[in-house]
């Protein structure tokens, strides 16, 4: 695959040789045989709505079925996706993106600059209640919109024609390009969302896709589904896998047993299994980016208001 979208989010996995070949081969020769990957999640996904997702399982799916201005390639290097060219002003506060003209949604609609404008305004609108809307901070008027002091239309983003997008920042953001590869900033199809109403993104059939895969079979609560190659994806020739079969497996021991029996192409390992299997065929370690924290409930337990106690 052109991007590393399907690499495991866990630090340690066991993967079969066939899996690694399907996900990581850079060969210009493509096999005539259809390629299927049997993968797993450690938790249920909750939504396909990039504006409302907060969990890793949902973001893994969104990253594979949707696409933004950039994607993360090898070694997490930012590379162009929907953006064909980018200009940044001398003061670092104005970004201009040219969007590729051959990108389409799975319903046939073209992906345009207006899809980004709509998406960002929808996400940052307090009515949407996006838990990650704070990530827009630094974009012109974002903080004021989140706090309800300004309307979403005041956000520093505009479409200059069908395929040119301009973003205005309040200050230089050194990690801005990296931020644009996060699903929260992906485009959204306004016509489709308004047609679906409250059903939007609650199951596979209530979703429209512009990424390398389409999701099928997720009802909103079941524990297995598939990704299938998206025939309308602009770079479909670079997508090596035809199908990815997902299932939710919550315990490492179950993962490993299914892997051993050939029912999974990879398995997440717990600390004990890591020690015993380290160095064996298929054992793989990958760095992961994560933030963990503890949050004190000061309403239920007022004693936690004492900062000395918390320390």
Question: Where on the chain are the PLM-derived regions?
Answer:
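C-terminal motif of bacterial Sec signal peptides marking the signal peptidase cleavage site
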Residues: 20-22
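Short, well-ordered beta-strand elements
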Residues: 33-46, 84, 94-97, 116-119, ...
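N-terminal lobe/hinge region of extracytoplasmic solute-binding protein
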Residues: 41-90
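Aromatic- and charge-enriched surface segment that lines or borders ligand/interaction sites
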Residues: 84-132, 303
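Alpha-helical secondary-structure segments
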Residues: 112-118, 162-166, 242-243, 291-311
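Surface-exposed binding/hinge segments that line
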Residues: 133-190
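Gly/Pro-rich hinge or "lid" segments in bacterial periplasmic/extracellular proteins
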Residues: 169-238, 243
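Ligand-site clamp/hinge motif
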Residues: 232-275
């Amino acid at each position: 695959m052109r991007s590393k979208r399907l690499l495991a989010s866990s630090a340690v996995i066991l993967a079969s040789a066939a899996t690694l070949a399907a996900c990581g081969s850079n060969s210009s020769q493509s096999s005539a045989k259809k390629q299927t990957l049997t993968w797993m999640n450690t938790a249920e996904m909750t939504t396909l709505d990039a504006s409302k997702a907060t969990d890793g399982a949902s973001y893994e799916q969104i990253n594979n079925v949707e696409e933004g201005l950039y994607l993360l390639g090898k070694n997490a290097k930012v590379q162009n996706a929907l953006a064909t060219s980018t200009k940044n002003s001398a003061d670092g506060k104005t970004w201009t993106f040219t969007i590729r003209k051959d990108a389409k949604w799975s319903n046939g609609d073209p992906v345009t600059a207006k899809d980004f404008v709509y998406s960002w305004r929808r996400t940052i609108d307090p009515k949407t209640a996006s838990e990650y809307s704070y990530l827009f901070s630094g974009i012109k008027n974002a903080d004021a919109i989140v706090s309800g002091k300004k309307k979403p239309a005041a956000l520093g983003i505009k479409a200059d024609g069908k395929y040119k997008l301009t973003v205005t920042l309040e200050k230089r953001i050194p990690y801005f390009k990296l931020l644009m590869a996060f699903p929260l900033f992906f485009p959204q199809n306004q016509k489709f969302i308004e047609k679906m109403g409250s059903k939007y993104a609650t199951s596979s059939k209530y979703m429209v896709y512009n990424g390398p895969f389409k999701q099928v079979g997720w009802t909103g609560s079941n524990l297995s589904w598939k990704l299938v190659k998206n025939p309308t994806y602009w770079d479909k020739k670079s997508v090596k896998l035809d199908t990815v079969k997902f299932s939710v497996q919550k315990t490492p021991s179950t993962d490993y047993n299914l892997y051993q029996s050939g029912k999974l192409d990879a398995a997440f390992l717990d600390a004990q299994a890591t020690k015993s299997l380290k160095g064996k065929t298929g054992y793989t370690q990958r760095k992961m980016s994560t933030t963990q924290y503890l949050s004190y409930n000061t309403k239920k337990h007022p004693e936690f208001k004492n900062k000395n106690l918390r320390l």
